[in-house]
C-alpha cells in the first residue's frame, strides 16, 4: 500500500513511520510512504498557508492554493483522498478494513479551523472523524487512521492476531494475563492455566460479552443482530442475566 501524508509538520508522521510495527512494514516493502510538506507549495517569503475565513469568524483556515498544489503533486493512480476532520463520518473498524483494500491513500492533516471547502469539493473522497472530540493536530488523527488501516493490510500483523482483536466480531477483546501468576493477591483465572482449549475459548467469549456489555452496550446490540452471533454466545449472555432491547433492523 502507498500512503501519502500531507502536513504542515512533517516531523510528526516521520517519527511514526520509523517506529515499531510500521517501521517493519516499511522495511519489508508492505507499506510505502511519502510525506508532503504543504509549506513547500506556499510561494510567499514566509511560507504562509493560512488566512482568515470569508464572512468572518474565529481562527484561520488552510488556504486552497498550497494545499491544492500539494495534492496535485501526489503521483499515485487510483488514490483515495481522506481528510480527517471532526465534521466527518465516524471512523470504525469496518471502514479501516475497507480502506486497507485500496492501492493508495492520501491523508490530509488539517490545522487551524480546517481547510477551504473548495479543496474538499474538488479533491476529497472521504471526510472522517476519529471520535467526538477536537484535537489541535490533524497529524495525530491521521496517524490513528493510518495505524488502524495498516494493521489490516496483509502481512503487517499476523492473521491470528487480527482475528482475536476487538471489534472483529463486534465485541471488545477479552481480558488477558501473563506472568506472574499472582500479582498483588490477584490470581490468574484458573481456566487459563488448565490447558483445556475448549474451556478457555468459552471463558474468553463469555468475558468478551461481559466486557462489551459493560463498556460498549451499543456494540453488543449490533453483535446480536449479526450473522456471526452464535447460539453459544446467546446462551452465555443469558447466563449473565442480562437482556438487551432488540437491535433495530432499519
Swiss-Prot record:
Record's catalysed reaction(s): guanosine(37) in tRNA + S-adenosyl-L-methionine = N(1)-methylguanosine(37) in tRNA + S-adenosyl-L-homocysteine + H(+)
Keyword Acetylation found: no
Protein name in the entry: tRNA (guanine-N(1)-)-methyltransferase
Cited Gene3D superfamilies: 3.40.1280.10, tRNA(m1g37)methyltransferase, domain 2 (1.10.1270.20)
InterPro entries given in the database record: Alpha/beta_knot_MTases, tRNA_m1G_MeTrfase_C_sf, tRNA_m1G_MeTrfase_TrmD, tRNA_m1G_MTases_N, tRNA_MeTrfase_TRMD/TRM10
Lineage per the UniProt record: Bacteria, Pseudomonadati, Spirochaetota, Spirochaetia, Spirochaetales
Binding-site residues, S-adenosyl-L-methionine: 110, 130-135
Organism: Treponema pallidum (strain Nichols)
GO MF terms, alphabetically ordered: tRNA (guanine(37)-N1)-methyltransferase activity
NCBIfam families (alphabetical): PRK00026.1 (NF000648), trmD (TIGR00088)
Keyword Cell inner membrane among record annotations: no
Subunit structure: Homodimer.
Assigned GO CC terms: cytosol
Gene Ontology BP terms: tRNA N1-guanine methylation
Function (record text): Specifically methylates guanosine-37 in various tRNAs.
EC number: 2.1.1.228
Alphabetized UniProt keyword annotations: Cytoplasm, Methyltransferase, S-adenosyl-L-methionine, Transferase, tRNA processing
Family: Belongs to the RNA methyltransferase TrmD family.
PANTHER family, alphabetized: TRNA (GUANINE-N(1)-)-METHYLTRANSFERASE
Subcellular location: Cytoplasm
Disulfide bond annotation, renumbered to this chain: none
